[in-house]
Structure formats: C-alpha cells, structure tokens
Amino acid sequence: MSDFKTIQFVSVVIPVYNEQDSLSELLKRTIAACDSMGKQYEIVLVDDGSSDRSAEILREAAQRPGSRVVAVLLNRNYGQHSAIMAGFNHIKGDLVITLDADLQNPPEEIPRLVEAADQGYDVVGTIRQDRQDSWFRRRASRLINGLIQRTTGKSMSDYGCMLRAYRSSVIKAMLHCHERSTFIPILANSFARRTIEIPVKHAEREHGESKYGLMKLINLMYDLVTCLTTTPLRALSIFGSVVALLGFAFAVLLILMRLTLGPQWAAEGVFTLFAVLFIFIGAQFVGMGLLGEYIGRIYNDVRARPRYFIQNVVRANQPDEEQEK
C-alpha cells in the first residue's frame, strides 16, 4: 500500500457533534496550521447530527467566498467513526489528517504529521503526552489499547487519539470495506505497510463534555472484541471443554464419595452441587451473549444498510449537494 510520492494536497477531516462553542477557535487554529505548511489543503468538517448550532456554523464557514472548508451535514447522529468515513468520501488530498473538534489535540500538530508522512509512511499515529483526561478515562484507554495490541498484533500504543495521518491509498482501501462496525485506526493499520507514531501535546477540554461516557466506552469495548477477532469464540470452546472435563471428574468424585461415605454424605453435598451448577449456568449465559454479539454483527452486515445518510454537502461558490451514502 505504500506510496512514496511527495505530499502535495492535505485534507483534514473533523467530525463535529454539538461543538458550537469551540468551532470558531477550531477553524481559526486549523486554517493557520494548514497555511503554515505551504501546501494545498482543504478542511472537511462532518456534522454528526448536532442538536445545537454546529451545522449552521459549518454551513456559514463553507459558504464564505474562497473558503477551503467543506461542510458535510448528516441527517442524524451515526457515531464518530461513521462521520469520519462520510468525510473520507469527500476528500481530494494525497494525505488525510483526522482531528477531533474538542481542541484537546492541538491543530498546530498537523504540520508535524505531514512531515512524518512525507518520509514514506502510510499511517502516522500519535501518542498523547501528559494527558489531561480523568483517571477513569486514562485507565479505560490503557485497557482498550492493551486489548487491541493483543488481538491485532500491532504495536501502536494510543489508538484512542484521533489525531492521525493516512495516505490516500489507505483511505481508498478502507472505503471498499462495508462492515457496519468500523474502528478506523485499526482498519487503516491492516492496510498499511509502514507505520510510525510521534508524540503530540494534549490539552484540557475547554468547552462541553466528552461524548464518550461510561456506556459508550463499554459499547466500544464490545465492538472491539467482536469486530477485531474470533479469539473469544475459540476461548469459549476451550473453556467449554475444560468445564466438561471438570464436570465429568466431579461426577466421578461424587460417586466415589457416596460409595465410600454412604448416602448421608451425598445428601449433604447437594448444596455444593447446586453452587457449581449455577456457576456453569452463568458461564453459559456469558457465552450465549457473546455469540449473540457476533450473530448480530453478521445480521447487520448482511442487511448492507448504509453507514450514514448525508443531508447536504456545502462548498464555497457551489450549490448544496444532496446525496445519500
């Protein structure tokens, strides 16, 4: 997948969800950072069904004469990664930078990612230095990163940071993938030949609250487990085999104890038997739930419904485009 051509055009893709308070500063700083590169660029902002004035602000920014902003407006909220994929469908650049709209990852880091990619890398990841998140978020991030590394074998250490750079060849490969559950950094790494990570700054969130609460992090964990690997299913098979052997051994033990100690011992051991039985029943329900997750994902993929629906695409000096994806 490697493409060693010098980067001429940079596309910055930013998903936006209820970020009206930070958009003005985001646009100002991102444009300044891109101007400093001395390359052609565009800034593609994807409104993911915001309920505040975010979509209106993006539309106004894109309609200014000579604006390099492209506003992609989704009709409702589809999630961060679906919004980014919608942005990927409207890029022109040789290199694509993804960036969150909350300004925790400074836009001023964009030139450094472009410089690293210009050395011939397909994907440039980032590692957040001196993270300004809560203890819970840091621990959850470490757990998720560890899970990803073990299941994918990829050594990148901070998959939660969306400030990343992708060659256009990698973007095209990802757009050919139609699975519903998409975790972009992992998907990109599966197509990349050369990857690198660089340290970047991390700032406190100044406006609003994080869109990843406890339940969203739990859902993300389930998504990662079931969309990355079938290892949990293999583990369940091994666990089931071990349980069957232990159950057989326990049955033999009960028979021997009854023959040795008499029927009175067997009656007293009934509660132990029930305790073990409930443990096995609980394990079965866990296995059934995990299997259901896989079957549900297969069902969603077979239906082949679109990841998102685009309401409008707004560019400078062009009428709004209405289309479905």
Curated annotation (Swiss-Prot):
EC number(s) stated in the UniProt entry for this protein: 2.4.2.53
Record's function text: Catalyzes the transfer of 4-deoxy-4-formamido-L-arabinose from UDP to undecaprenyl phosphate. The modified arabinose is attached to lipid A and is required for resistance to polymyxin and cationic antimicrobial peptides.
Cited NCBIfam families: PRK10714.1 (NF007986)
Database matches in CDD domains: DPM1_like_bac (cd04187)
GO CC, one annotated term: plasma membrane
Biological processes per GO annotation: 4-amino-4-deoxy-alpha-L-arabinopyranosyl undecaprenyl phosphate biosynthetic process; lipid A biosynthetic process; lipopolysaccharide biosynthetic process; response to antibiotic
Protein name: Undecaprenyl-phosphate 4-deoxy-4-formamido-L-arabinose transferase
Keywords, sorted A to Z: Antibiotic resistance, Cell inner membrane, Cell membrane, Glycosyltransferase, Lipid A biosynthesis, Lipid biosynthesis, Lipid metabolism, Lipopolysaccharide biosynthesis, Membrane, Transferase, Transmembrane, Transmembrane helix
Localization (cell): Cell inner membrane
Family of the protein in this entry: Belongs to the glycosyltransferase 2 family.
Pfam assignment, any one: Glycos_transf_2
TM region positions: 236-256, 270-290
Position of the signal peptide: none
Annotated membrane topology: Multi-pass membrane protein
Involved pathway(s): Glycolipid biosynthesis; 4-amino-4-deoxy-alpha-L-arabinose undecaprenyl phosphate biosynthesis; 4-amino-4-deoxy-alpha-L-arabinose undecaprenyl phosphate from UDP-4-deoxy-4-formamido-beta-L-arabinose and undecaprenyl phosphate: step 1/2; Bacterial outer membrane biogenesis; lipopolysaccharide biosynthesis
Catalytic activity of the protein: UDP-4-deoxy-4-formamido-beta-L-arabinose + di-trans,octa-cis-undecaprenyl phosphate = 4-deoxy-4-formamido-alpha-L-arabinopyranosyl di-trans,octa-cis-undecaprenyl phosphate + UDP
GO molecular function, one term: phosphotransferase activity, for other substituted phosphate groups
